[in-house]
Amino acid sequence: MKSFTTIFKRNKISFKENLFLIILSIFLSSEILFAQQAEPTFAWPEGKQIAISLSFDDARASQVDAGTALLDQYGVKGTFYVVPNSVRQRLEGWKKAVASGHEIGNHSFNHPCTGNFPWSRQKAIENYTLKKMRNELILANKDIKELLGVESEVFAYPCGQTYIGRGENTKSYVPVVSKLFLSGRGWLDEGPNAPQFCDLAQLTGMEMDGKDFEQILPLIENAKKSGAWLVLAGHEMGVSGNQTTRLSMLKKLIEYAQNPANGIWIAPVGTVAKYIKGQKG
């Protein structure tokens, strides 16, 4: 027969374990409650659950040769971050895109990126100054205005790189972008934008090039968990190829987004950015 002392010790241990679990449960419940109180659900227009923006870089010919026609078919407005010299190569197509209501953003004058890319060696951001970058962004805006008659309010960082200079002299040009534009978008980021928290000058941009809708859907579902803003970014628009957003994927994505049951607001970057800015006061 077990001794009274042994039974007492075991009951004492059991009591301590139960007490620990009760305290842990109360702590976790209070943490969850605090998180819910600290970060209320963001109110998207018309009760939507999330926002999605479709954005495309570089003013590539395929965007106006094939891409905008698909967007127009569904009444969807995209955001096109352009480089002036590329616009000149398809000027009439870009004028038509503007007339259709697509947003034209600034993607710099020379598309400077790190000199680690051989093609960018002569315009490496390591050799830029903040003054040079600012002047070129203003020059690009001026050219876009002259070519297309619109003011670019949004910007996308070439190659997603937000710095200039080297080593101890490296500087962020995010403050420059913040002063000149409503928003600045990155590239190859890993998550959507939290509307209550995001820095409009450093919006995340998630790649949609080379992906089927089945690969994009998890990004949408993840954004729904927190009521986020998913900014998708691409380049060429076509059937297939390098750095190409597939038209077949876009068709499925748009049809999914336009189904009221899915609770998605699909709008240009500038439109969503202005809404968020207005909500923040």
Where in the sequence are the language-model features?
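Boundary/entry segment of secreted carbohydrate-active catalytic domains
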Residues: 36-64
